[in-house]
Amino acid sequence: MTTIPLFFTFDEHYVVPALVAFHSLLAHADRQYRYRLHVLHPGISDRARRRIASVVGRFDHGEVVFHDTSMYEAELASCGGKSHFSKEIYFKLCAPTLFPECDRIICSDVDVVFTGDVSKAYFAYPDEDFYYAGVDTILPTNRLPLYASFDKEEQHWLAREICANFLLLNLKALRRDDMQRRMTEYYKANYARLPFPEQDCMAIFARGQVRPLSMRYGVSNVYYRVNADTTPFYAHCLCLPADDAARRAEFKAALADPIQLHYIGAEKPWNSCGVPKQGVWLRTLWEAGQTMYYIRCLPGILRQKWRRYSLRRFIGKLMRKIKQ
C-alpha cells in the first residue's frame, strides 16, 4: 500500500483545530492509500499528543508521528511572532532535511476542514520539474503595497506567490538545488519585513518552479461573502481558467465542493462568532467527538485571542504615534 506523507506545524494553542483537521482529512481520504501525518511541534503536552493519536487511531489508514522542534529555538531566537503567525511556519522551509526518506510530501495548515479527498494532489505533475504546487491568489488583494521595500524582480514574483495553507513539496528537487539553505538564510535575515514569511520566501526563490493545483484544495471561507457572478478575480491567478465564464463556473464549483476549507485571518471558528462557514467546523468538531474537549479548552482559547488582540491594538496605537 502506498503511503502518502503529510506534515503540519503547530503549537499547543492549535491542538483543537488540529483534531478537527485530522479527523476530516482521514474521513474523506481515499482508503486505498495510507496517510502518515507528521506533526512538527515545539513541545506540545503528552496529554495533547495522546488525544491527537486517539483521533487519528480511529482510522486504520492513518498514523501520526510527532517531531519535537524545540531544539531549534536558539536558531530562531531572532524571529519573533507575527500577529497570528508563529515560528512554527519556519519548518515549512525545512522539509527537505526533516523528511529525508520522502521525495514528495504534502504540507497543510490546521485551521482547515477537509471535505474531500487529498490523495490526488500527492501525485500531481509526475513528470515535471518543480518545487511547489498549490493554490494561488484567487480574488484581488491589497497586500502588494506591503512589499514596497523589495526590488522589482522580487515584487514580480511576490505578486505571483501561491498560498501556503496547502502545498505539494517536491523534496527531491528542493534538495538538488539546495533550496532549504537559501530560503532559511533569507528568512532569518529578512524576517522583520516579510509579511507572510514562509510564503514570501517560497515565492522569491521558487519563481517559475511552481505549479497550480485546483482551487478546490484551498477555498478560503471569506470567498463565500462575495457574489460569484460579479466578483473580480486576481490578475495573476493561474488556478482558474482565463475565460471569464469558465473562470466563474469553476469558482462556483469549488465553493460548492471544496476539498479543503481554509479559515483565514485571526477570526477563527473556535474563537469567534459569525465566521463564514463556522457551522461546517462545529459540525466536524462534533463528528470528531471533541466538542466537550473544546468546551473545556475554550477559556484558554479566548484568553489567547484577547492577549493577541490587545497586542495588536498596542502596536497599532504605537505606530500611529510614531507617524504623527
For every predicted segment, state its role.
Residues 36-43, 134:
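Short internal beta-strands
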Residues 5-8, 25, 36-39:
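Hydrophobic targeting segments
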Residues 105:
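Short aromatic/hydrophobic "clamp" motif used to bind/position activated sugar donors
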Residues 55-98:
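Active-site-proximal specificity loops/subdomain of glycosyltransferases
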Residues 15-30:
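Histidine-anchored nucleotide/phosphate-binding helix
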Residues 2-4, 10, 164, 171, ...:
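A glycosyltransferase accessory/donor-loop signature
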Residues 108:
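Catalytic metal- and UDP-sugar-binding loop of GT-A-like glycosyltransferases, i.e.
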Residues 112-148:
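Conserved donor-nucleotide/metal-binding helix-loop-beta segment in metal-dependent transferases, i.e.
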